[in-house]
A protein has these predicted regions:
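Conserved, well-structured core segments that form the ligand-binding/active-site neighborhood
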Residues: 72, 202, 206, 313
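Hydrophobic/aromatic residues within the transmembrane alpha-helices of Major Facilitator Superfamily
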Residues: 23-30, 60-63, 67, 144, ...
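Helix-loop-helix hairpins and the membrane-proximal interhelical loops
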Residues: 1-49, 162-164, 195-279
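Loop-to-helix transition at the N-terminal end of transmembrane alpha-helices
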Residues: 44-63
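Transmembrane alpha-helix interface/packing and boundary motifs in multi-pass membrane proteins
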Residues: 61-74, 183-189, 247-254, 285-295, ...
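Helix-loop-helix junctions within the multi-pass membrane cores of secondary transporters/permeases
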Residues: 2-36, 57, 77-136, 264-359
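Membrane-embedded alpha-helical modules
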Residues: 93-207, 211, 321-396
Length: 396
C-alpha cells in the first residue's frame, strides 16, 4: 500500500529510510512547538491552546504535503512571521490577535489563488532577485533582535538606544550559553541541535531552581480558546492591506526558496530540468496557511530544516507523513512546553536568525540598482521593528 501511494522503489528509497528521514526532520523542527506558543502568548493568546494548535496545524500540514504532493517536506508555523504577528501587528499596531489571524487567513487565501493560477509565476519573476533574498534576511535580523532582547543580551539605553545586557544575571548568562550550546552541536552536525540546546538550558534552570518542574506528559490542553477565533471581517480594512501583503510576500518567497532547495537535494528534478510536482507542493503549502488559522496559528510554511531529512535519505511524502505523526504525538508534552522560559528559547531565536542571514551570500553585489533597495529592506525591517515597513521602504 505504501509503495503504491508513495512510489518508494521508483524514488530509490525504502520504508526504513523514510522513517529515519522523517524522524530526523522532526527533531530539527521540533523547537517550534516550544518557541511558537511562547511567542503567541505574548500577543494575548492562551499558551496551552497555542501549543496544541501549533502541533495540530503542523501535523495536518505535513500529512497533507505527504499525501497530496509526495514531497519530503515538513511544515509548521514559520519563524519570523510569528514574530511579525506578535510584536508588530498586535504589539505595535494594536490589533487584536483575532484580527491578526484574520489577516493571516486572507493572506493564505491569496497565496492559494496564486498557487493555482499564473499569478505565482508572475509575482516570482516580477520582483528582482535581490529583493526576494533581502526579505528573508531582513526577517532573520528581526528574529535575531527579538532573541537578543528576550534573552537580556541587549537592553534599552536612553543615551545609546541599546547597550549590552547585565551578564551578572543568571538568566542572561543562560541565554548566551544556550546559543553557544546550539552552535557547538550544529558545528558537530548533531541532529536536533536547536531543540537539544533549548532542553539543556531548561533542565539547567530546573536544577538551579529558576524553573518549577511540573512533569513531562499530560492530557493536552483545550484548543477552544484559539479554535476558529480569527476575525476576518475585522481584517477587511484598508489599513490591513500592507500587513496582509507582508504575510503573503514573505511566505511566498520563503516557501519558493525552501521548495527549490529541497527539490535539488532530493533529486525531484526531471531530465528537462523541471521540478516534479512543484505546483502541488505550493498548493499544499498555501492551503496549510489557511488551515492553520482555523486552529489559531500564524502562517504555516515549509521548513528549510527538511533538507536534514533529505540528507538522511528521505525522497517521498512518506517522510512528511512521519513528521506529521511526530507532531501529533507531541501534544501530550504540554507540561514541558509550559515551563520553557524565554532565556531557554533566546539562543534558538538567535541561531535561526543567523541561518536566515546566510542568504546574503546570494545577493548580486555588482548591481547597485538592486543592491541598495535590498540592503534598505534588510536594515530597516529590524530597525523599524516591522516587516511591512521594511519591505515598503525598500520597494519605494
Amino acid at each position: 500500500m505504501l509503495e503504491k501511494i508513495f512510489e518508494l522503489k521508483l524514488n530509490n528509497t525504502s520504508l526504513k529510510k523514510e522513517l529515519l528521514a522523517g524522524f530526523t526532520t522532526f527533531v530539527t523542527m521540533a523547537y517550534i512547538i516550544f518557541v511558537n506558543p511562547q511567542m503567541m502568548a505574548i500577543s494575548g493568546m492562551d499558551q496551552g491552546a497555542s501549543f496544541v494548535a501549533t502541533c495540530i496545524a503542523a501535523a495536518v500540514a505535513c500529512i497533507f504535503m505527504g499525501f497530496y504532493a509526495n514531497w519530503p517536506v515538513g511544515l509548521a508555523p514559520g519563524m519570523g512571521l510569528n514574530a511579525f504577528f506578535t510584536f508588530t501587528v498586535v504589539g505595535e499596531l494594536g490589533y487584536s490577535w483575532e484580527i491578526a489571524l484574520g489577516a493571516v487567513f486572507l493572506a493564505g487565501i491569496l497565496f492559494v489563488i496564486m498557487s493555482i493560477t499564473n499569478l505565482r509565476k508572475w509575482m516570482l519573476e516580477s520582483i528582482p532577485f535581490n529583493l526576494r533574498i533581502a526579505m528573508g534576511c531582513g526577517v532573520g535580523l528581526f528574529v535575531g533582535f527579538i532573541g537578543l532582547k528576550s534573552g537580556g543580551l541587549i537592553v534599552a539605553n536612553e543615551a545609546t538606544f541599546l547597550s549590552l545586557g547585565n551578564f551578572a544575571q543568571i538568566e542572561t548568562l543562560l541565554s548566551a550559553l544556550g546559543f553557544l550550546i546550539i552552535s557547538v552541536l550544529a558545528v558537530r552536525k548533531v541532529p536536533g541541535a536547536i531543540i537539544l540546546g533549548v532542553l539543556i538550558i531548561t533542565f539547567t534552570g530546573i536544577i538551579i531552581g529558576l524553573i518549577e518542574f511540573n512533569g513531562l506528559v499530560s492530557a493536552p490542553p483545550s484548543i477552544a480558546p484559539t479554535f476558529l477565533k480569527m476575525d476576518i471581517l475585522g481584517a477587511l480594512d484598508v489599513a490591513m492591506i500592507s500587513i496582509i501583503f507582508s504575510f503573503l510576500f514573505v511566505n511566498l518567497f520563503d516557501t519558493a526558496g525552501t521548495l527549490l532547495g529541497v527539490a535539488n537535494r532530493a533529486n525531484l528534478v526531471n531530465k528537462n530540468g523541471e521540478i516534479i510536482d512543484i505546483d502541488r507542493a505550493l498548493k499544499a503549502d498555501s492551503s496549510s496557511s489557511v488551515i492553520g488559522t482555523f486552529f489559531g496559528c500564524s502562517p504555516v510554511t515549509s521548513y528549510v530544516e527538511s533538507s536534514a531529512g533529505v540528507e538522511a535519505g528521505g525522497r517521498t511524502g512518506l517522510t512528511a507523513v512521519i513528521v506529521g505523526i511526530c507532531f501529533l504525538f507531541s501534544i501530550f508534552f504540554s507540561p514541558l512546553a509550559s515551563i520553557i522560559p524565554a532565556f531557554a528559547t533566546a539562543g534558538a531565536l538567535i541561531y535561526v536568525a543567523i541561518l536566515m542571514l546566510s542568504g546574503m551570500e546570494k545577493l548580486n553585489w555588482s548591481d547597485i540598482t538592486e543592491l541598495l533597495p535590498a540592503l534598505i529592506i534588510i536594515v530597516m525591517i529590524p530597525l523599524t521593528f516591522s516587516i511591512a515597513n521594511g519591505i515598503a521602504l525598500g520597494f519605494i
